[in-house]
């Protein structure tokens, strides 16, 4: 019975993930092996969702960073639907409960390596 429940939960997670447009698969990498990011997509995000600090639709946004909801290293898309504004303090904390650590624990579970 327990195996059936576990299988059903796993199937539900995989199905939900397959339908989630924030997932794109393994990330593109540049010549140095770093994950490639699109400056055009980031600019598009900021035009659609201005900086929370100063309302700027381009340029600097003091105290805020563009964050990927599903990390690129975990198969997340480098696209507007997978981006959000996040206070820089939330991204730079060393806590084991930091957003990036939590996201990797949740999203990096299906074979997409960082």
Tell where the protein language model's regions lie, with residue ranges.
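Nuclease and nuclease-like effector domains acting on nucleic acids or nucleotide cofactors
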Residues: 1-65, 70-114
């Amino acid at each position: 019975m327990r195996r059936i429940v576990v299988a059903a939960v796993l199937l539900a997670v995989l199905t939900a993930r397959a339908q989630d447009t924030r997932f794109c698969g393994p990330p593109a990498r540049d010549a140095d092996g770093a994950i490639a990011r699109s400056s055009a997509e980031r600019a598009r995000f900021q035009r659609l969702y201005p900086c929370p600090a100063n309302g700027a639709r381009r340029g600097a946004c003091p105290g805020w960073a563009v964050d990927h909801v599903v990390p690129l290293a975990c198969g997340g898309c480098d696209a507007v639907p997978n981006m959000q504004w996040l206070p820089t303090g939330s991204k730079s904390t060393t806590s084991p409960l930091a957003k990036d650590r939590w996201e990797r624990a949740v999203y990096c579970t299906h074979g997409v390596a960082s």
